[in-house]
Amino acid sequence: MATNTEQQTIIRQAGRSDAASIASIYNHYVAETVVTFDEQPISKEEMARRVEEVQAAALPWLVAEHDDRVVGYAYAAPWKRRAAYRFSVEITVYLDPNYFGRKLGTKLYNELFANLRSTQAHAVIGGIALPNDASVALHEKFGMHKVAVFEEVGFKFNRWIDVGYWERTL
């Protein structure tokens, strides 16, 4: 667990009791942005199921807690289900918009990458709905490089969305 006493931010493993807070953060992005391709809000029960599924795969799901409130999260999930992909993971980070600019994404990814080094993960992949300069910068800060852009693979809010993929190995 990482702490920053100056800002009272703790990075820790998510628990079932965090599901409502995680869903609230995520549902902002569902309703207001194209960074997720979900189009309907998800319930806290569905979010709890997602967290449990990731953790059952022995992968990290972390939350950033500031003053006892979950204000962001990051996790690594299996990249694909077929056996030969078993050493590849996809990483994701979401922040409460009220906490942008506080380097929480960096703190979460620092801890996420540290956690991943103790797993069997080899390839780390990040998918980014484009354009998204902040997310691109965060992923590149962690040594990831662009390997692909899939054009017009998503359609949300009456427009086509490209998705770029960034990758690195551990």
Language-model regions, residue ranges each:
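Glycine-rich phosphate/pyrophosphate-binding loop shared by adenosine-nucleotide-utilizing enzymes
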Residues: 9, 69-73, 161
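A short beta-loop-alpha structural element at the N-terminal edge
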Residues: 10-22
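Conserved GNAT-fold acetyl-CoA-binding loop/helix
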Residues: 23-51
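Acetyl-CoA-dependent GNAT
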Residues: 41-98, 109-110, 115, 169
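Conserved catalytic-core motifs of GNAT/GCN5-like acyltransferases
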Residues: 75-78, 125-128, 140, 145-162
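Conserved beta-strand-loop-alpha-helix junction that forms the acyl-donor binding cleft
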Residues: 100, 126-136
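Conserved acetyl-CoA-binding loop-helix of GNAT-fold acetyltransferases
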Residues: 101-114, 137-141
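Conserved GNAT acetyl-CoA-binding A-motif
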Residues: 116-128
